[in-house]
């Protein structure tokens, strides 16, 4: 869609099962953020396109696997740009990497903890705005500690995911997808030219396997063991160390 100062950036992916075709709408605003946003949605489209010949029932994958190809696409784009960046550009790209890590590993979990607490409160009756703020502050402090001044008190009021009545707890799947995408980067480095057959096979299984089964069959690991997820986090931790070593004034 044509950019305009009267618009905000945005993108979404959809699919047409009858025609077996994915579609992406996006507004390119001339920023790296919108490039990554486009990459995210194209990851969704590629995921479905790989499954287009399967029975429709096998193309319906759980939310925990929905965000894997999309976040992996983002990660690949960031890596590509980072490999070709000078130190000043690398600082900006690593900042984007750290923003993603903080969003998927911390902010997303704040949203989930708040939503779970809100559901428990709602069982007792109507939850007031004041009580919602209290619940958000508690969840925020659990994850951010004293690293921020205050909390995003009204995140519950403006975050669209809370109002998708057909999908409860639509938060943590992003964390699972992010961690799996980091694991996929490790597989990309390890497999090199053999990566794409592995990746295609994994994505095609997402509509007929659980996360645990995907991890066991394709990664050869146990999803119930913290070691697998800690291994997936190594890439993000490496980006933090590299970011800390760069002087932005150079």
Where are these regions (language model features)?
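Post-HExxH zinc-binding segment in Zn-dependent metallohydrolases
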Residues: 62-90, 97-99, 103, 177
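Post-HEXXH active-site segment of zinc metalloproteases
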Residues: 36-37, 48-75
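Active-site-adjacent "gating/activation" loops or surface patches in catalytic cores
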Residues: 1-39, 43-47
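Short beta-alpha connecting loops at secondary-structure transitions
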Residues: 23-27, 54-61, 93-100, 119
């Amino acid at each position: 869609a044509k950019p305009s100062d009267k618009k905000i950036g945005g993108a979404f992916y959809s699919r047409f099962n009858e025609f077996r075709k994915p579609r992406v709408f996006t507004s390119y605003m001339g920023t790296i953020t919108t490039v990554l946003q486009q990459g995210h949605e194209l990851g969704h489209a590629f995921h479905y396109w790989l499954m287009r010949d399967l029975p429709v029932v096998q193309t319906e994958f759980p939310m925990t696997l929905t965000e894997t190809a999309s976040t992996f696409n983002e990660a690949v784009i960031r890596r590509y740009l980072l490999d070709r960046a000078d130190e000043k550009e690398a600082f900006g790209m690593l900042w984007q990497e750290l923003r993603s890590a903080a969003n998927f590993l911390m902010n997303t979990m704040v949203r989930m903890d708040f939503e779970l607490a809100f559901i428990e409160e709602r069982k007792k009756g109507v939850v007031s705005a004041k009580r919602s703020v209290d619940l958000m502050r508690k969840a925020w402090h659990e994850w951010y500690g004293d690293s921020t001044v205050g909390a995003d008190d009204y995140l519950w009021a403006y975050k669209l995911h809370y109002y998708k009545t057909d999908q409860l707890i639509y938060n943590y799947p992003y964390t699972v997808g992010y961690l799996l995408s980091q694991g996929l980067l490790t597989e990309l480095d390890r497999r090199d030219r053999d990566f794409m057959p592995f990746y295609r096979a994994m994505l095609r299984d997402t509509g007929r396997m659980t996360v645990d089964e995907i991890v066991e069959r394709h990664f050869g690991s146990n999803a119930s063991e913290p070691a697998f997820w800690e291994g997936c986090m190594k890439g993000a931790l490496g980006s933090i160390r590299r970011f800390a070593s760069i002087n932005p004034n150079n």
